[in-house]
Amino acid sequence: MESITNVPAANVGRVVQDFIDDGATNVAVEQNPDVTFNVTRN
């Protein structure tokens, strides 16, 4: 499992796409209280 934490909202789509392009089959996005996001791949 690999996570990138505190991703600004404007970059979430790019990070998710990068993970998918790299072969990830499961990508989870969770919002943090400070309006950044954590993106995790399995």
Q: Predicted regions span which residues?
A:
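Short glycine-/aliphatic-rich beta-strand segments at the starts of folded cytosolic domains
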Residues: 1-5
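Short, charge-rich amphipathic interface segments used for partner binding and complex assembly
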Residues: 6-42
